[in-house]
């Protein structure tokens, strides 16, 4: 048996030697002879390597190629891994250039593998989806909102459509935090042929709106998917599952939409999770700001490598100015020497940040304090931004944490000190702004800087004084430090400047108006030629009769005529020279006086109008209605203003002028409106600068006891004595009734009757003024028909018979719009709010009928009826006549404001007769409502539920 085993043993030994020599020769070829190619790769092994590379399993293979100390061409790198797969046990563990063991995972290896892994079809598709998300130009735009956001789709024919404009007017800047808190995103579609377009309005967590244009080709697809009707305004509210939650055929108040959303169970969880969200959102200060974006989805959230992240951070670090303290250098050496600590801290970065740290330490020579921010990773840069991430505090080195607490208070002042040139450039603005802010509160807080501000605006006389103050203020290092006390300038001129500059009409009046000192100069200079002209006239007067004598006597000689002409020329030359001399002297005197004594005696009689002068222009001619309001948007003032603007004609016949004072007591502006008849001469009582004269306004306030910052109103007669005080807005009818009892008014009425003076209301009353007449006072029931013989219109009129009490108690006004084309007209029926049966009727002009139909999108060719609430929004639409008004009353009585009215009316005992409305009286309805009467009309809740008005 031993002789049989011998050949087998020798064969095994020979094969072992051959294999060993082959592996050694391959190792020598790869290490010692890089120029030779190794022909030992079998086709099977190469196919397996290609298969692994294509399926994404060649990560280990690619790593081994990167571990070679001297890699050559791409073909060589491609061939080496095949040998490794064929003989995995022969090769020793990988080593570096100097023989030191290499870490298994290095940053360059990851980069190399990533470049090879691009061949993977699945990963490239994923990265493509991340780089180009479903944006506004993508057909699956709704899919980007699925599971995350609710979608509010607004569809309109075009941007100028009436309903669309009405809906956008309801979207004030202060509603977007509420929308963001409910995860609502908006899509606007314009579907009219030729004007197709739209936009996606993404609302951020700060309330900012990111607008992206919508691809017009997507409009028909979205319209068909959401089942929106073309040619009409409509809105759809989608759930987070993209199911339709609610449809709205006309604009609605946002409260109604909120109520629909808040009924969902998921909304309760959102409320718990997002406590204080709205307050934080509003505190950001950018609520309602619109930012236009491209149509790539605004995302760009692609998977960027770690290397690209480092490249993004480096330029941000290089921009930091050397404002930190030198001891921060110690943290640089600590971060540079130990390699393991950065690994758990910097977002799964292996020791690659070591190279960044060494690079940063080499820059310490040029910038002293920069290395701290470089080695501390993004966490150290966060304290310099406005928002702090929660992880930045825990991973920050202790030295940097101390420095942030020390530097914390100074961040609000100025983060990075500017160079000296920029400091000098920015100093005047820094000293000017805080004083402007304080001037709104009080005028005596910082007088030196206010004088400096005023003097920079002045041109001419005060320029020397300005230069000196400029030099003083440039000496201060801190821009927020108020300069030292200057010499107080006495007199009235600086105060006037100070007051004018401190009010809100500064830009309007102060830029175009010269200062009073210039006005004095111009007045004096203008007076001088007039005196010289008088003197020259005196010289010329005796010469004229001499000429006449010479002509009459005919005895004068030509030489005498020549002499007289020479004398005239000499006199003219002298007068011109005297004019120029006096101009120079006066100009020099005024400049010297202003330089040495800013308030000379000739400046004292300023053209400021006193209260006596102001009231003297009204006395015996006009009655005054004086109103004070803290701001022009004050609700009480707006209500009173709408009241008197509606009755322009009655104000004019009673000769009323309205003086309105805006702003607080110490910083007010004034507006004067004269209501006059057509045959009266237009009045101009004060100049523009007097409207912002604080002294005049404060004196006027004291004269009539209007020394508060609240709404207040005073009525006077033509003798300017106070007749009535009002602390709240009041109907102008009661004011007119009071005025008609004055003795002066009775005389005016008799005089106007004799002269036949009548006042016609404005022929072209605007739609806005007409609708503002009913806002927050009346509900409108608009009925439109092609003519008064229309069948539906006549049926509706029969249903309205005998409903005067119900209409009056519900504050309903009926507006009838009749006619087609040019033959149109309207009738307005006003029902008393006490429920009496008397009805006041007014004619509505043709142009207003057309405007109302266009505004509410009512077709003149068909019958239609709509209910408009007190807030001016359409509450319900009725395309056919309502045989019974029960449904209309149900809708009105379910509104929040109406419930308050019902409580007041019941306490006062105001009610309609039980038999008037066929057993559906006021009391019986109230009982039915308490018992759930509204459930019988549940189909109305989808459109009208939740309306507060």
From Swiss-Prot:
Q: Residue spans with biased composition (Low complexity)? A: 345-360
What induces its synthesis?
Down-regulated by oncogenes (isoform 1). Isoform 2 is down-regulated by beta estradiol in mammary gland (at mRNA level). Isoform 2 is up-regulated by beta estradiol in mammary glands (at protein level). Up-regulated in lactating mammary glands and mammary tumors (at protein level).
Which subcellular locations apply to this protein?
A: Secreted, Extracellular space, Extracellular matrix
Where is the signal peptide, in residue numbers? Answer: 1-27
Composition skew (Basic and acidic residues), residue ranges:
308-328, 419-429, 463-477, 499-511, 534-548, 556-581
Q: Which GO terms describe its cellular component?
A: basement membrane; extracellular matrix; extracellular region; interstitial matrix
Q: Where in the body, by tissue, does this protein show up?
A: Isoform 2 is expressed in uterus, liver, lung, spleen, kidney, heart, bladder, skeletal muscle and brain (at protein level). Isoform 2 is expressed very low in mammary gland and intestine (at protein level). Isoform 2 is expressed in lactating mammary glands and mammary tumors (at protein level). Ubiquitous (isoform 1). Isoform 2 is expressed in ovary, uterus, mammary glands, liver, lung, spleen, kidney, heart, bladder, intestine, skeletal muscle and brain.
InterPro entries given for it?
DUF4174 (IPR025232)
> Is the keyword Glycoprotein in the record?
yes
Which residues form the Glycyl lysine isopeptide (Lys-Gly) (interchain with G-Cter in SUMO2) crosslink?
A: 544, 547
Recorded superkingdom: Eukaryota
Protein's UniProt name:
Coiled-coil domain-containing protein 80
Q: Which organism is it from?
A: Rattus norvegicus
